[in-house]
A protein has these predicted regions:
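Active-site-proximal N-terminal segment of extracellular/periplasmic enzymes that hydrolyze or transfer
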Residues: 108-113, 117-160
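His/Asp/Glu-rich, glycine-adjacent segments
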Residues: 2-7, 12-19, 38, 45-46, ...
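Secreted, luminal/periplasmic, and some membrane-associated catalytic domains
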Residues: 1-49, 133, 146-148, 156, ...
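C-terminal, low-complexity/hydrophilic appendages and adjacent surface loops
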Residues: 37-38, 44-76
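Short, structured active-site-proximal loop/turn typified by the sulfatase FGly-forming signature C/S-X-P-X-R
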Residues: 139-188, 233-237
């Protein structure tokens, strides 16, 4: 990592500047880049600077604090009780590890089986559950070490790969979830970020329309489900379509069926009936107002607020965590996941830790409160699995870390909208035109038609940014 006090460089050449980065950093960027879909210019802010604003920090980049995530395996009789281990690991290792647990055949991919965590017990667990705490990388867990006692217990009683990383950059939700599901990195599976260059040349949003057509390869859920003749129950409850990359493709692929998809979004749980199914009782699932009222009373003052913030109009508080946990447990119970002889798969994402990191910052007490709420939800899920399913395995990870407050690091935000304006100003672009089609968390999608008109090259723009 470059020292924070080195603010000037001897060269503006993008090749020279890129080669000055470590091999580890360059490898992460290479894994996360697709020449057809990614930004045309990739930016790597010098630590502790970051993309975003003072108010809304960004978490996309190759640096260690954004890359290191928990990767904890737990399952009575299925996962070895060895605590923290130093073995290298990545989220792409989840793909072959789930297949190994379930005794299924999947296509060989980039990840490796986390065999040191598995006991090799006979048979297969009745349920394998993958839980993602969105944005809760090791930096966040280290910041609030007392907020997650249930996860800490899983670390002690299972196997925790404390050096695990997401392995690619940008460290962003759609890309990492697809890496979890497919066992390969974005340069292979094709999901490079929230925004990407579509085949028609326009900048589009990943998983638009709640389909997985953007993903070039199948997931472990697809393959394991078909390996068992579509007999397993395969389900996911998450927050947004960005999380679908780790799930199945449903009936969108040959041989697939209508697996169960439930996305909470903004308070109404919905799915995509074209390729998936969703239990009807989830559509108007009750309890959000009840959870909001309970949280409202917790500070002794009934004013509709938590820590001074509206509860129901936002999604950055424990009420939403508890509501998701209630709905998820209802789905597990009523659909009978793990309650017959056919092994099942269930996946979930708790988004609130990430939302709080963006809205308030990972160093603020709101983050501690939401992280603890997610840990309590984890405890509730484990209680149910222990009582009813008994033979199960849980894998918990995160999709990226978060950016600490610039007040603590001395970092300076790099606003991508401002970069777009700066480029146009520097190259004297006529009013109403732009050299950029769009910007993303890590770079610029260039407008090649305008560049040709003004006789400006990629290299010139990159040198200006350097």
């Amino acid at each position: 990592m470059l020292a924070a006090d080195k603010r000037t460089f001897s060269s503006e050449d993008p090749v020279a500047r890129g080669c000055a980065l470590s091999k580890e950093i360059l490898l992460r960027i290479w894994r996360g880049h697709d020449p057809k879909r990614s930004e045309d210019i990739t930016m790597v802010p010098q630590y502790p600077n970051y993309s975003g604003t003072f108010v809304v920090p960004n978490h996309s980049g190759p640096w260690k604090y954004l890359q290191q995530v928990p990767l904890v395996l737990y399952g009575p009789g299925r996962v070895a009780e060895q605590g923290q281990v130093q073995d290298p690991a990545s989220v792409v290792d989840i793909y072959p590890t789930v297949a190994q647990l379930m005794g299924a055949s999947v296509a060989p991919r980039g990840g490796r089986v986390l065999s040191s965590a598995l006991t090799g017990a006979a048979g297969v667990p009745k349920l394998v559950m993958v839980i993602v705490w969105d944005g809760a990388g090791r930096d966040m867990l280290d910041r609030w070490p007392d907020a997650w006692p249930n996860l800490a217990r899983l670390e002690r009683q299972g196997t925790s790969y404390v050096n695990a990383t997401i392995g690619s950059s940008p460290s962003i939700t759609p890309a990492t979830h697809s890496s979890i599901g497919t066992g390969v990195y974005p340069h292979v599976h094709g999901v490079v970020g929230i925004k990407y260059r579509a085949s028609n040349g326009k900048v589009a949003n990943a998983f638009s329309g709640r389909t997985t057509a953007i993903e070039r390869v199948t997931t472990f859920s697809d393959q394991i489900d078909q390996d068992y003749g579509n007999a397993p129950k395969v389900g996911m409850m998450a927050w947004r379509s960005w999380h679908m990359g780790m799930f199945s493709h449903g009936s969108e692929i040959p041989g697939g069926d209508h697996d169960q998809l439930a996305l909470i979004g903004h308070g109404k749980i919905t799915g995509n009936p074209t390729y998936y199914s969703m239990p009807s009782y989830l559509e108007h699932f009750p309890g959000l107002k009840k959870e909001g009222a309970k949280l409202d009373r917790a500070d002794g003052k009934v004013d509709g607020k938590w820590m001074g913030h509206d509860i129901l109009s936002t999604h950055d508080n424990p009420a939403w965590v508890n509501y998701e946990a209630d709905a998820e447990l209802a789905m597990l119970k009523r659909e009978g996941y793990g309650l017959d002889d056919v092994p099942d798969i269930f996946m979930t994402n708790f988004k609130m830790t990430d939302i709080v990191g963006h809205v308030f910052g990972m160093d603020q007490p709101e983050e501690q409160g939401v992280l603890h709420a997610q840990d309590v939800a984890l405890g509730r899920i484990l209680d149910y699995l222990n009582k009813k399913v008994k033979d199960y395995a849980v894998i918990l990870t995160a999709d990226h870390g978060h950016t600490p407050s610039p007040k603590l690091t001395g970092g300076w935000p790099i606003a991508n909208g401002e970069i777009k304006r700066d480029i146009d100003t520097h190259f004297h672009v006529p009013s109403g035109e732009s050299l950029s089609d769009d910007t993303s968390a890590v770079g610029v999608f260039l407008n090649y038609a305008e560049m040709k008109k003004l006789n400006i090259s990629e290299d010139e723009i990159a040198r200006f940014l350097n």
